[in-house]
Amino acid sequence: MSANKKTLVLKVGGALMQCEMGLARLMASAANIIKSGQSVILVHGGGCLVDEQLKANGMETVKLDGLRVTPEEQVPIVVGALAGTSNKILQASAIKAGITSVGMSLCDGAIVNGSIKDEQLGFVGEVSPNDPTYLNFLLAQGWMPIVSSIAVDDAGNLLNVNADQAATVIAKLVEGQLVLLSDVSGVLDGKGQLIKTLDKAHADELTKLGVIEKGMKVKVEAALEVAQWMGQPVQVASWRDAEQLSALEKGESIGTQVMPH
């Protein structure tokens, strides 16, 4: 892979996995980007699938400030849905698009350090960058890592990590270009219009007004953190417009550009 092109770190959500056409488009774009000489890492959640599995097992989905509460009895279901089914759905789609991929989680290769985020959230983790060696090895082979947001702490507890937060840590690890993809075109204002550029002051104002809330609040906070840490913009965009990803190679913005402050 070209040394002068930053690795593209794409975060995708669970809704994408329920849209076969959207998934195929995303993988076709990823394949083209890899062929052009740029490495790609896919980091994923799988909230919709987790919700379905919990419901099928007679369990409730509870969220606190946009983060999923994960009590101990739900851990096997969450891990199975994310590190298992969701990861393999994405890998199958990658193979179909001609991409050589490696399905993995945050536990692999000591890439991150994991710990319990907040006792109120149960087995929800927060992670920090540790060692990029394993990821760099995979990228050097021209392979695309597909990373589920399941981590392990030093005590051996399986932890559910918010996928936006997981993607920020992966982007830091490889010093990559982060794009957070969701099912909306970017960050929207109170009238539902796309905000082209967003800085911390504007984000804080919209959060106070309740315009940015729940899952988007977590996403914007993650984007601001990486933008500031790396001194470069982070994109929040829609996976429905996956063809636009090639525009990033030319330095063009897609969706909302979250700026360092």
From Swiss-Prot:
Disulfide bonds: none
Record's catalysed reaction(s): N-acetyl-L-glutamate + ATP = N-acetyl-L-glutamyl 5-phosphate + ADP
One Gene Ontology MF term: acetylglutamate kinase activity
Annotated keywords: Amino-acid biosynthesis, Arginine biosynthesis, ATP-binding, Cytoplasm, Kinase, Nucleotide-binding, Transferase
Record EC number: 2.7.2.8
Main enzyme class: transferase
Key word Cytoplasm present: yes
Pathway(s) it belongs to: Amino-acid biosynthesis; L-arginine biosynthesis; N(2)-acetyl-L-ornithine from L-glutamate: step 2/4
Sites marked Transition state stabilizer: 11, 219
Gene Ontology BP term (one): arginine biosynthetic process via ornithine
Keyword Transmembrane helix tagged: no
One Gene Ontology cellular component: cytoplasm
Residues binding substrate: 46-47, 68, 160
UniProt subcellular location: Cytoplasm
SUPFAM superfamilies in the cross-refs: Carbamate kinase-like
PANTHER family: N-ACETYLGLUTAMATE SYNTHASE (PTHR23342), N-ACETYLGLUTAMATE SYNTHASE, MITOCHONDRIAL (PTHR23342:SF0)
Family: Belongs to the acetylglutamate kinase family. ArgB subfamily.
Record's function text: Catalyzes the ATP-dependent phosphorylation of N-acetyl-L-glutamate.
Protein name: Acetylglutamate kinase
Organism of this sequence: Shewanella loihica (strain ATCC BAA-1088 / PV-4)
GN (gene name): argB
